[in-house]
Amino acid sequence: MAPPVRYCIPGERLCNLEEGSPGSGTYTRHGYIFSSLAGCLMKTSENGAVPVVSVMRETESQLLPDVGAVVTCKVSSINSRFAKVHILYVGSTPLKNAFRGTIRKEDIRATEKDKVEIYKSFRPGDIVLAKVISLGDAQSNYLLTTAENELGVVVAHSESGVQMVPISWCEMQCPKTHTKEFRKVARVQPEFLQT
């Protein structure tokens, strides 16, 4: 059976220098090893030597969307003023827990903002690349924008359930029924394409 995982906080005394040597996420003071991070305590030893004591952070749980970060999100609902989304990835890193975001009508396009209609840009279930423009507060969500050519819908499904193909910057087409639907289509950059 694996030993229980021990979590520690910054400044917590882990052991004395005779019991281990300091590794990453630690520092020494007065003959003791202390944690410099919040995370899991790890002890590794090779060939019966004094174990190296280190503290590893759970990176995926610590990752938060920050202003300017490109995020991948899924549209959950739309109305005439904004689209509600769940943020699933920050860059290419998946999040343990989804964050809520809002794309306002005026943040969808860089031009002709007064002519934008939400239902011609997004539909519930669409996967969207967006950029964080504001962190919001305790009551509100992250504010996101798609007002760049590289941002917008990257995956959408037609009413028949088939993944649609982009045919212009504002339309996608179902390959099965050839029905066209309006979307704010992203010009996907090569680094985001998975082959």
Curated annotation (Swiss-Prot):
It is found in: Nucleus, Nucleolus; Nucleus; Cytoplasm. Belongs to the CSL4 family. Pfam families: ECR1_N, EXOSC1. The modification Phosphoserine is found at residue 21. SUPFAM superfamilies: Nucleic acid-binding proteins, Ribosomal L27 protein-like. Keywords: Cytoplasm, Exosome, Nucleus, Phosphoprotein, RNA-binding, rRNA processing. This is Exosome complex component CSL4. GO terms for cellular component: cytoplasmic exosome (RNase complex); cytosol; exosome (RNase complex); nuclear exosome (RNase complex); nucleolar exosome (RNase complex); nucleolus; nucleus. Coiled coil: none annotated. SMART domains: S1. Its main location: nucleus. Non-catalytic component of the RNA exosome complex which has 3'->5' exoribonuclease activity and participates in a multitude of cellular RNA processing and degradation events. In the nucleus, the RNA exosome complex is involved in proper maturation of stable RNA species such as rRNA, snRNA and snoRNA, in the elimination of RNA processing by-products and non-coding 'pervasive' transcripts, such as antisense RNA species and promoter-upstream transcripts (PROMPTs), and of mRNAs with processing defects, thereby limiting or excluding their export to the cytoplasm. Component of the RNA exosome core complex (Exo-9), composed of EXOSC1, EXOSC2, EXOSC3, EXOSC4, EXOSC5, EXOSC6, EXOSC7, EXOSC8 and EXOSC9; within the complex interacts with EXOSC6. The catalytically inactive RNA exosome core complex (Exo-9) associates with the catalytic subunit EXOSC10/RRP6. Exo-9 may associate with DIS3 to form the nucleolar exosome complex, or DIS3L to form the cytoplasmic exosome complex. Exo-9 is formed by a hexameric base ring consisting of the heterodimers EXOSC4-EXOSC9, EXOSC5-EXOSC8 and EXOSC6-EXOSC7, and a cap ring consisting of EXOSC1, EXOSC2 and EXOSC3. Residues 66-147 form the S1 motif domain. It comes from Mus musculus. GO terms for molecular function: RNA binding. One of its GO terms (biological process) is RNA catabolic process.
